[in-house]
């Protein structure tokens, strides 16, 4: 495993099909920690599956790392890294401090499990883009694909997303709400059910994705931003994941457009 004492909490910029050159902010770092344990996660099998919020990395270190980073080369600053960013209790504080340094847009990639918590929603509302994962239309599929922490249900996730959207409207925020769907063999035939949820939520945008990075057998911090040639630096064996064909992806996109009339972007278009 990489010596963490020499690793920055800020990495990149890396190329992202969704947002361009993205500078990553890792609020967790020391171990992979998430309220999901997705079967396709680029971090591999999550070491700490939890819903408990805490301080992982001090705000001071993160801001110091940010100032030393190549942030001026980035198009956007993205909170992702070694797990679920909303688990970090200093998420909101870090966002505020970074906004004092730069006006570059800030994105948060989240699985939505903690959005039911008002404090968490307050933490994320100053972001410019909140991208929420939604791969499953029911609890059975949620457990198959996302393997959530105990107590997490699809109902609680959907309710949290709706509350977030309501907060954005009530506070007159310009925050963009995106729903990201990772299509896998387990959910590719559930388009109608997912479309129904999307019509309930009415996000500003839907991002269709399929795994583009392999699933490592173990965790190494390099996996938080590994793309292309970088995946060869991972010290653990990696397992390629089955993805959708271009034809399947086009059919899914066309069907979702037909059923939702929402703004849709797709990894296959980039």
Predicted regions: what they are:
Residues 73-74, 79-81, 98, 106-107:
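Glycine/small-residue-rich loop that forms an oxyanion/phosphate-binding "nest" at active or ligand-binding sites
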Residues 27, 79-81, 181-183:
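Short glycine-centered, acidic/aromatic-flanked micro-motifs in structured strand/loop junctions
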Residues 4, 17-57:
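Canonical Radical SAM [4Fe-4S] cluster-binding loop centered on the CxxxCxxC motif
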Residues 38, 74, 127-128:
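Short, well-ordered alpha-helix to beta-strand connector turns
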